[in-house]
Amino acid sequence: MLPKSSLKETQQALANAIRLGNADPLNGYAASRLAVYTRLVRNNAFGFIDRCFVEAPLHIEPEYWKNAKENFVQNGNAHSPYFQDIAGEFLLFCQEKEIFDTNILALMDFENTQLLAEVSLAKVPEKFEWNRHSVMQLSGAAYLKSYDVDFLSSDFKQFDDTPIQAIIWRDSDFRIQQQILSELDYWLLSYLQEQPNSLENVLSALNTMVEDSTSIIPLLEQVWMKWVTSEVIYPEQR
């Protein structure tokens, strides 16, 4: 059996060889075995990345995208042992290294948020009862985002220099949805994200913040109903 220090050194050397794609023999490891490990790591990492980021690569030269993934494997630091987190690790790496421009990074953040909604452990109820006094919460599978660029209005075809606020969520049928939010939408959903509450209490809070809320109240009630129907807000889960 190898001494512990020697074993650690061998493991580190093997990891470095796989990272760098170095297929030279290493401490008894045949070049063919190293090549298999190297391909396996890249196939898994690249596969998870490409399944998450579908739209962003369409705005990038293929070779540049390929090089970014290789750069990540060679130089990135893993903060999570789970495969489903690889895409998020890649996004963080690209953000820290400023590998792509801010528009691309914003779109990548959006696509990664879609993945987060998909794999969220939150249970979205298909049916529920509520009334104006029911304490309601923002769905645990919903994410509020703000971006300095609009790629949603064009269905990801172009980047418009217009700030947007958006929501990405998963419904009870496990469909991932997204929508640009109005200021009233964003205010209501942000409010419920911070503190679950009833419609009556939210309306009362609105009265204390706005001098004359008469015209806003019916709009807020419509917005509330819209998000209840969309399964974005539902009775608080404890």
Curated annotation (Swiss-Prot):
Name the record gives this protein: Uncharacterized protein HI_1599
Source organism phylogeny: Bacteria, Pseudomonadati, Pseudomonadota, Gammaproteobacteria, Pasteurellales
UniProt-listed Pfam families: DUF2063, NGO1945_C
InterPro entries in UniProt: DUF2063, DUF2063_N_sf, NGO1945-like_C
Organism, as annotated: Haemophilus influenzae (strain ATCC 51907 / DSM 11121 / KW20 / Rd)
